[in-house]
A protein has these predicted regions:
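A conserved ligand/cofactor-binding region detector
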Residues: 1-441
Length: 441
């Protein structure tokens, strides 16, 4: 643990317009009134702010009680909160990135170093868990000093590694995150991050952010991956079904697929001529995959908001004790030490899985299974980005395996599941590798 890197959660922006007296709640409250009025929300707002302050605030309370308080979540969507969060853990960022309708820009340990150290819960001070995290960081530093790339050295780092992120979301998804922290298995550091976010939002939008029970209804939210849940029976069964001799699959598995009637010429027109009407039709192709990957790669996959995902729980993954050894570590003087430290760290967490605070010592190398659904448009868009040679090597391998399946079962779509520059007609990267010079026939 390194001193001086304290968590800092800042609400840096929210939807408002001080010049026209729109506060953080007005876009939602006046927009809601506009659903029942012939006037526009802007005209309604002009009349609302002419009222006495007490009446104006009471009317906001009433409209929220009768709309979002009765399950009309679209009212909550008419808000926006942007946070800059420093020195939270990567366990927290995994949690924040689960809801699909939140957006994030996260510090990359592929390019930034882990100089901030790690978070240590009070109940782990002076325990073997603290010693293990010191060992993880010490090995990370030695590997970096010996020219092991940062993107590979980071695999040994624990989830309690400190990082930074910028997050933007609306009131509905902030409530979603808040509800998720109330479940069993969520570490206190994660809860602290989200609770600070909620309290800051309540300071500027107290009536909008009020818990009215119906606006905290789980069925009203787009379900998010639950990495920290106690169990995920469906994914456990899928892993078992596709296991061989009790060994879980080591490669991506295509679980199912479906399509609609679209001729190859129409798909070519959609992609190559950017025909958005036909691109929208491609969303009705469906591909579901079960993909094993390290937590390091899952950090990237979970931020791909156009993928529908459900992930195996960390607790389930700990039982298998499988982890990724990056190619740049294999065959080096560090390989054996890396493997032994992974086994000890994972074993320690597995044996104490009932202690939610111990989850943070789990290394990023731990393999979890991600249940991924993509549509035909994603087969071009997201697969194109993830198969680019500039993409991280592990997520690139996962994307290429998915692309190979798509080429087999839906060749009319799979033809375009190629690196993005080939589709764009030019490489968007700063240093082109030449792969995008290929042409689609």
């Amino acid at each position: 643990m390194i001193e001086g890197f304290e968590k800092k959660v800042e609400l840096v922006a929210w939807l408002q317009n001080p010049e026209k007296s729109w506060d953080a709640e007005d876009s939602a409250s006046c927009g809601a009134r506009g659903c029942f009025d012939e006037k526009s929300s802007a005209d309604i707002h002009e009349k609302e702010i002419e009222r006495l302050k007490e009446e104006y605030e009471l009317r906001k309370e009433n409209i929220f009680r009768e709309t979002s308080g009765r399950g009309h979540g679209a009212v909550l969507d008419q808000s926006a909160f942007a946070y800059s969060i420093d020195n939270l853990t990567r366990a927290s960022t995994l949690f924040l990135c689960a809801p699909q309708y939140a957006s994030h820009l996260q510090q990359s340990l592929r390019r930034a170093t882990a100089e901030r150290g790690f978070y240590l819960p009070k109940n782990l001070e002076g325990t073997c868990a603290e010693d293990l995290m010191h060992e993880q960081f010490e090995l990370y530093n030695r590997m970096q000093s010996s020219q092991i790339p940062s993107e590979d050295a980071r695999f040994i780092l624990p989830l309690y590694t400190k990082t930074a992120i910028q997050t933007k979301l609306d009131a509905r998804e902030l409530m979603h995150l808040h509800s998720m922290t109330m479940r069993e298995g969520v570490a206190s550091e994660i809860k602290d991050t989200v609770e600070q976010m909620v309290e800051l939002a309540r300071e500027v939008a107290p009536k909008l952010m009020k818990n009215r029970e119906t606006n905290y209804e789980v069925l009203a939210w787009m379900p998010a991956s639950q990495l920290f849940a106690s169990e995920n029976k469906t994914i456990e069964e899928l892993i078992n079904i596709h296991s061989t001799n009790w060994n879980a699959p080591e490669k991506v598995v295509l679980l199912n697929h479906a399509g609609i009637h679209m001729g190859s010429n129409i798909i070519k027109k959609a992609v190559m001529q950017r025909d958005e009407a036909e691109l929208a039709n491609m969303k009705h192709y469906h591909f579901s995959f079960l993909a094993p990957m390290s937590l390091a790669s899952f950090h990237q996959a979970t931020r791909q908001r156009t993928w529908d995902q459900s992930v195996e729980t960390i607790r389930g993954a700990l039982n298998r004790e499988k982890y990724v050894t990056p190619p740049n570590i294999k065959g080096t003087e560090f390989e054996q030490e890396y493997k032994e430290l992974n086994k000890r760290s994972i074993g320690y967490a597995r044996d104490r899985v009932g202690d939610k605070e111990v989850i943070g010592i789990v290394p990023h190398s731990l393999i979890v299974y991600d249940l991924i659904h993509i549509n035909g448009w994603n087969a071009v868009h997201s697969i194109g980005k993830r198969t680019c040679t500039e993409a991280q090597w592990e997520i690139r391998s996962v994307a290429r395996q998915m692309a190979d399946y798509i080429k087999k079962v839906a060749p009319e779509i799979g033809k375009y599941s190629v690196p993005q520059g080939i589709i764009f007609g030019k490489c968007p990267e700063k240093k082109p590798c030449g792969a995008c010079d290929k042409k689609i026939e």
